[in-house]
A protein has these predicted regions:
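Short C-terminal beta-strand
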Residues: 161-170
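Gram-positive cell-envelope targeting signals
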Residues: 92, 173-176
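Two-component histidine phosphotransfer core
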Residues: 1-154, 162
Length: 177
């Protein structure tokens, strides 16, 4: 747990280092450390399955992109069910784009929240600033990559939520050129 705390703090503080992107591999390592911390806080509450298509771990993505989605799945999806649940992180190529999915078996999101999110507004119903991490990820993708890339949320109340990020396929070695 100490290693996970130190690694998470170190990586989070590096956000201001001028690099806005990191590899999928590093992003998954940060997310794993975050999950270690949450498993300590909430033992036996959630399971996580990660599936990353072969050859995609060197793709570049915005820093601290997966962790806020996983955090949201735990805190706003799984925990309110008062039962254990599962979270999937799935990374694959679809139609020439990088697709990152975070899916949970949580309580789901209301249609009103989904509508507000699609309109670019806050998902929080009472301006409590819940879901700020999800909104931050959405806004950073729009800023960094423009039209054709972004975030979609699919949800059924009582069944769970799937967040789908669509990103360009950029390799780490391409950035170094």
């Amino acid at each position: 747990i100490v290693h996970s705390l130190i690694y998470t703090l170190h990586e989070t503080l590096k956000v201001g280092d001028g690099n806005v992107e990191t590899t999928i591999e590093k992003e998954l390592e940060l997310t794993k450390c975050y999950l270690d911390i949450q498993r300590y806080r909430y033992p036996d509450v959630f399971q996580v399955e990660v599936k990353c298509e072969e050859g995609l771990k060197d793709c570049l993505v915005p820093k601290t992109m997966i962790q806020p989605l996983v955090e949201n799945a735990i805190l706003h999806g799984i925990l309110p069910t008062e039962a254990s649940g599962k979270i999937w992180i799935i990374i694959q190529k679809q139609g020439g784009k990088l697709c990152v999915m975070v899916k949970d078996e949580g309580i789901g999101v209301s249609k009103e929240q989904l509508k507000r999110f699609k309109q670019g507004e806050t998902m929080a119903e009472n301006k409590t600033r819940k879901h700020i991490g999800v909104e931050n990820v959405r806004d950073r993708i729009r800023y960094l990559y423009g039209e054709g890339f972004g975030m979609e949320i699919q949800s059924t109340q009582g069944k769970g939520t799937t967040v789908i990020l669509t990103l360009p396929v950029k390799r780490a070695e391409e950035k170094e050129r």
